[in-house]
Amino acid sequence: MSWRSESIWIEFITGSRKTSNFCWAFILFLGSLGFLLVGTSSYLGRNFISLFASQQIIFFPQGIVMSFYGIAGLFISCYLWCTIFWNVGSGYDLFDRKEGIVRIFRWGFPGKSRRIFLRFLMKDIQSIRIEVKEGVSTRRVLYMEIRGQGAIPLIRADENFTTREIEQKAAELAYFLRVPIEVF
C-alpha cells in the first residue's frame, strides 16, 4: 500500500503480520504440541492421545526424539508468534522531494534497535537497482543505491512480485526521485 502526492511518496511495508506467518506459526505449534504429547505419554506410559497405545512407542530412543522435536518446535513457534506480535519488519519508506530527504523506518525486535530509522538526502541517491535471480527459487529485490552507504533493500526478497511489477515499481520510483535504474 502506498500514498502519493506531487512532492511526497509514502510506501507502507507489511512486516511479519502476514497470513502465511499466522498459518505456519499455528501449524508448527499444533504439530510440536503433538510430538511433545506423544513423547510425554511414552515416558509416563499413559495414553494422552487416543489414536494409538502408548506402549507402541518406546521412550528410549523414539520418545526422547519426539519430545526433543516437540520442544524445539515449540521454541520456533514461540519465535514466530513473537515476530507476529511485535510486527517485525513493518514500517514505511518516505520520499520527500520538497525537503530533499528520504526516511526509511522499520520495526525490529525489542531492545536498543527496536526502531530502525534511516535518513538520507535525495542528492545522495545514485540509482534504483533491480536484482533478479532466476532459478528454482526466483528472487527479485528492489534496492536504492546510496552514495557512501551501499544498497538498501526497499522490497523484501520473500515478497512474490512478478518481474513486471518490480520493473513498474522501480520505474515509478526512479521517475519520482529522478535517478537512473540499474538491473543486475
UniProtKB/Swiss-Prot annotation:
The keyword Nuclease does not apply. The chain crosses the membrane at residues 22-42, 57-77. InterPro entries: PSI_Ycf4_assembly (IPR003359). It is found in: Plastid, Chloroplast thylakoid membrane. The keyword Chloroplast applies. Keywords: Chloroplast, Membrane, Photosynthesis, Plastid, Thylakoid, Transmembrane, Transmembrane helix. GO terms for biological process: photosynthesis. It is a multi-pass membrane protein. Pfam families: Ycf4. One of its GO terms (cellular component) is photosystem I. Belongs to the Ycf4 family. Seems to be required for the assembly of the photosystem I complex. HAMAP family: Ycf4. This is Photosystem I assembly protein Ycf4. The gene is ycf4.
